[in-house]
């Protein structure tokens, strides 16, 4: 079919040749010069694709492959190959441009173009894998849209096979419906299942193209025929190509997604998706390109690639999916394309099986995961699983109306995509895929949240923070991070010295033996690390996830305990000296004192923490060391205000009062 011809012009040329060679197979709709055969890579391609898609709507146009291969095969093959390379490059550019071009176009246009593009690209890839890369210039059977309707699927298959072989020979041009997919997943070219599916898709898609004789016009022209594509549509596979097509087609604003369900974009999607049940595609033709709007051009591309795989899986379930797709027309453009594949082929022909295999071979897993809808795929891709699910669910509900694939709303989602292996469970698949997408999104979110909440990630503790899976993890972690920021220095230095035990003791030493370092150690180790993070944070220590404790040595604990007996608050100088003497960081010492004060407070509920257990050697609690410790280190104790840090020695009293 013209689709084989690489350029839109070639499409028209081949359309004319097809008119002669195919012997009037070309429908009157197909015009060599019709927009469908436009040479413009974007608009012409889109038009050609649309017209090609719509042009052959009447007959299967199975003759096209034969004719194209025979009549246009040699010249067109060369041209298409060139065009394919160009189109693939063009599609790549258009893929990048498609976002802008599609965005330029009305969202509906973008989507419809995207959808059409996938269809056109898919159609072209079906008819011409080489031409397909023509950015759908000749992808659509421009001339053959109306005039060329291949009655024999065999011819189309021949053409598809040639195209498939061509795209296999030249993975780059990949007029293949899966051109985009293949570009990203070149290994699919070596996948016999994928290739077979692609070929069948091409055959079906050729039928689709022929089934759109009314779409010689640009995509904008609504497909007057409801895409009664009796031909199986390999659309599922084409959706892979769809992203390229969408990037290619955007220039044809005529294909505004607003166009009625007959809009070529929708029809292209329908054609592409109905490769399994082309006869049911006509209902899809009613699907408005607006649904195509749903997916953004870029999303459409991503989704289409996934959709192609998903469509393959869906196509497996295409019979139910086609109804689902038509029902869920609004779901998403990408999902429309997929649903077109599935809804267009409600019968779930081998193409769907192929599509499924293709999914399995290439994007199968991803497509299966995103199987619910193209939007669901997008949801899976973009964590939009909820919306996609809803759309999919709707599509699934409609999908139950398998015959309702004609329903304008194209549930672009084949539930089977989420469940690749389940080719028949469309509604359940859609739901499953929706739920799977949702679960996946949830898992991702949970994972992200867990990462964010993971105290180990942000505490900077050398030691593992321990399991922070508690629901209170946030508050604890914040508290603990506060602690750990203080303790981390301890932990780091102490961990270097293997001070975990000491830190545990120290940190846990919230409340027992103040004076006895060993008992303190025991209490620390045994006691909850209440004072750990927040010297007054006792109580949360046991329940909240614990930061890895600084392991204080017994000597360190004894020294710290003795110092604590002397003064419960260390001055900056004292803390520094003590840290240096104990080979600890000031933060570790500070945190230890905070925890120790907390423990002491617990042990001595009514007593002033600031009152030194033992009068400082300098002369009682008011010794300069005591003052400094109280003043400067009162901050270490959460209870005393931080002001004492900066207070003069007199602040020692303040710090005591603070406590």
From Swiss-Prot:
Subcellular location: Nucleus
Region (7 X 2 AA tandem repeats of H-P) residue spans: 221-234
Listed PROSITE patterns: HOMEOBOX_1 (PS00027), HOMEOBOX_2 (PS50071)
Feature: compositional bias, Acidic residues: 388-401, 478-492, 500-519
Tissues expressing the protein: Mesodermal precursor cells of distinct muscles during embryogenesis, a subset of neuronal cells of the CNS and their precursors and also in cells of a small region of the midgut.
Any one cellular-component term (Gene Ontology): nucleus
Annotated GO MF terms: DNA-binding transcription factor activity, RNA polymerase II-specific; RNA polymerase II cis-regulatory region sequence-specific DNA binding
InterPro entries found in the cross-reference section: HD, HD_metazoa, Homeobox_CS, Homeobox_NK-like, Homeodomain-like_sf
DNA-binding segment(s): 545-604
UniProt feature, compositional bias: Pro residues: 250-263, 275-286
SUPFAM superfamilies: Homeodomain-like
Biased composition (Polar residues): 1-21, 136-152
Ranges of compositional bias, category Low complexity: 27-51, 95-108, 120-135, 287-298, 316-347, 417-435
Region (Disordered), start-end ranges: 1-63, 94-152, 198-298, 316-349, 376-440, 455-548
Ranges of biased composition (kind: Gly residues): 528-543
Superkingdom, natural source: Eukaryota
GO terms for biological process, alphabetical: cell differentiation; muscle cell fate determination; muscle organ development; negative regulation of transcription by RNA polymerase II; regulation of transcription by RNA polymerase II
Keywords: Developmental protein, DNA-binding, Homeobox, Nucleus, Repeat
Biased composition (Basic residues): 201-232
Sequence repeats: 221-222, 223-224, 225-226, 227-228, 229-230, 231-232, 233-234
Record-annotated membrane-spanning stretches: none
Main location: nucleus
Family: Belongs to the NK-1 homeobox family.
Described function: May play a role in specifying the identity of particular somatic muscles and neurons of the CNS.
Name of the protein in its database record: Homeobox protein slou
Gene source species: Drosophila melanogaster (Fruit fly)
Organism classification: Eukaryota, Metazoa, Ecdysozoa, Arthropoda, Hexapoda
The gene coding this protein: slou
């Amino acid at each position: 079919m013209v689709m084989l011809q690489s350029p839109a012009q070639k499409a028209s040329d081949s359309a004319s040749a097809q008119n002669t060679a195919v012997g009037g197979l070309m429908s009157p709709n197909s015009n060599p010069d019709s927009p469908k055969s436009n040479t413009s890579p974007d608009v012409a391609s889109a038009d050609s694709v649309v017209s090609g898609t719509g042009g052959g709507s009447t007959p299967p146009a199975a003759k096209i492959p034969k004719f194209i291969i025979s009549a246009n095969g040699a010249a067109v093959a060369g041209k298409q190959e060139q065009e394919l390379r160009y189109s693939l490059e063009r599609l790549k550019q258009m893929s990048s441009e498609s976002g802008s071009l599609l965005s330029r176009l009305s969202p509906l246009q973008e989507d419809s173009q995207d959808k059409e593009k996938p269809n056109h690209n898919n159609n072209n890839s079906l008819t011409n894998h080489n031409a397909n890369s023509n950015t759908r210039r000749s992808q659509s059977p421009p001339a053959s849209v109306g005039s060329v309707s291949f009655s024999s699927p065999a011819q189309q298959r021949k053409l598809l096979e040639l195209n498939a072989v061509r795209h296999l020979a030249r993975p780059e041009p990949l007029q293949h419906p899966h051109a985009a997919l293949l570009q990203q997943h070149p290994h699919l070219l070596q996948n016999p299942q994928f290739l077979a599916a692609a070929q069948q898709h091409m055959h079906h898609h050729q039928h689709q193209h022929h089934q759109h004789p009314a779409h010689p016009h640009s995509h904008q022209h609504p497909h007057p025929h409801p895409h009664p594509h009796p031909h199986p549509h390999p659309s599922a596979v084409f959706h892979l190509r769809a992203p390229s097509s969408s990037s290619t087609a955007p220039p044809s604003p005529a294909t505004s997604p607003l166009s009625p369900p007959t809009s070529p974009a929708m029809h292209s999607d329908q054609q592409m998706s109905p490769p399994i049940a082309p006869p049911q595609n006509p209902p899809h033709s009613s699907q408005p390109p607006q649904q195509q709007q749903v997916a953004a051009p870029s999303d459409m591309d991503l989704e289409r690639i996934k959709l192609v795989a998903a469509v393959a899986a869906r196509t497996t379930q295409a019979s139910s999916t086609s109804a689902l797709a038509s029902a869920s027309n609004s779901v998403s453009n990408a999902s429309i394309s997929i649903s077109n594949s599935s809804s267009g082929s409600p019968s779930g022909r081998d193409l769907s099986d192929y599509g499924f295999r293709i999914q399995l071979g290439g994007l199968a897993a991803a497509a299966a995961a995103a199987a619910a809808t193209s939007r669901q795929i997008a949801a899976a891709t973009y964590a939009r699983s909820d919306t996609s699910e809803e759309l999919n669910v709707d599509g699934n509900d409609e999908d139950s109306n398998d015959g309702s694939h004609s329903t304008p709303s194209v549930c672009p989602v084949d539930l089977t995509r989420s469940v690749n292996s389940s080719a028949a469970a469309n509604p359940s698949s859609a739901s499953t895929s929706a739920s799977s997408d949702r679960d996946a999104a949830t898992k991702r979110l949970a994972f992200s949240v867990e990462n964010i909440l993971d105290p180990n990630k942000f505490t900077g503790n050398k030691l593992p923070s321990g399991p922070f899976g508690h629901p209170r993890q946030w508050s604890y972690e914040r508290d603990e991070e506060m602690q750990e920021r203080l303790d981390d220095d301890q932990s780091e230095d102490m961990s270097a010295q293997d001070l975990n035990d000491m830190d545990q003791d120290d940190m846990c030493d919230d409340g027992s033996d103040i004076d006895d370092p060993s008992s303190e150690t025991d209490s620390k180790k045994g006691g909850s690390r209440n004072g750990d993070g927040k010297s007054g944070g006792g109580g949360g220590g046991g329940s909240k996830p614990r930061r890895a404790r600084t392991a204080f040595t017994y000597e360190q604990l004894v020294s710290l305990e003795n110092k604590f007996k002397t003064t419960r608050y260390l001055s900056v100088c004292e803390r520094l000296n003590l840290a240096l003497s104990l080979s600890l960081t000031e933060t570790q010492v500070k945190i230890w004192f905070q925890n120790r004060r907390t423990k002491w407070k617990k042990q001595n509920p009514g007593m002033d923490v600031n009152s030194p257990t033992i009068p400082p050697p300098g002369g009682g609690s008011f010794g300069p060391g005591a003052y400094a410790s109280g003043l400067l280190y009162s901050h270490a104790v959460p209870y005393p205000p931080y002001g004492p840090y900066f207070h003069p020695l007199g602040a020692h009293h303040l710090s005591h009062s603070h406590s």
